[in-house]
């Protein structure tokens, strides 16, 4: 089920901008799927996870590694924040982003620490895969 923040709430990605002016512009509208760099795509994907925007997640996942489907968040999942540890562009079409995403599920806090790989094809950035840290 797609969720959108009500009113101009802060973007889930943690940047000090309203969602429509931050990740929301990559999720819908004229700039749909047009994140300009790997870090912006990473932030927009985190926001999409928070908001259960599964179609966006699938469309920004590289076709070679994309799962056939994704499950929405369990009812007891609450995303708590995103921290970008490092963002590095190797060349014009390859980049990595290291991040820590914090969440709580069934009352238990957990962290996902990943080094993600991204590739740019036909003027679009895609998530390829990542190594859990």
UniProtKB/Swiss-Prot annotation:
Q: Name one Pfam family in it.
A: YchJ_M-like
Coiled-coil spans in chain: none
* Domain of life assignment: Bacteria
Stored InterPro entries: NTF2-like_dom_sf, UPF0225, YchJ-like_M
Its family remark reads: Belongs to the UPF0225 family.
Q: Which PANTHER family match?
A: ADENYLATE CYCLASE-ASSOCIATED CAP C-TERMINAL DOMAIN-CONTAINING PROTEIN, UPF0225 PROTEIN SCO1677
**Protein name stated in the entry:** UPF0225 protein BB3385
């Amino acid at each position: 089920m797609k969720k959108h923040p009500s009113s101009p709430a802060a973007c889930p990605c943690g940047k000090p901008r309203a969602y429509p002016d931050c990740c929301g512009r990559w999720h819908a509208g004229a700039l749909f799927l047009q994140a300009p760099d790997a870090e912006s795509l990473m932030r927009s994907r985190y926001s999409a996870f928070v908001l259960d925007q599964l179609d966006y997640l699938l469309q920004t996942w590289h076709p070679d590694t994309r799962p056939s489907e994704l499950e929405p968040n369990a009812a007891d999942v609450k995303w708590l924040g995103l921290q970008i540890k490092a963002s590095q562009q190797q060349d014009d079409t390859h980049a990595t982003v290291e991040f820590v995403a914090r969440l709580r599920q069934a009352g238990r806090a957990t962290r996902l620490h990943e080094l993600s790989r991204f590739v740019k094809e036909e003027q679009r950035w895609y998530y390829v895969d990542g190594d859990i840290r």
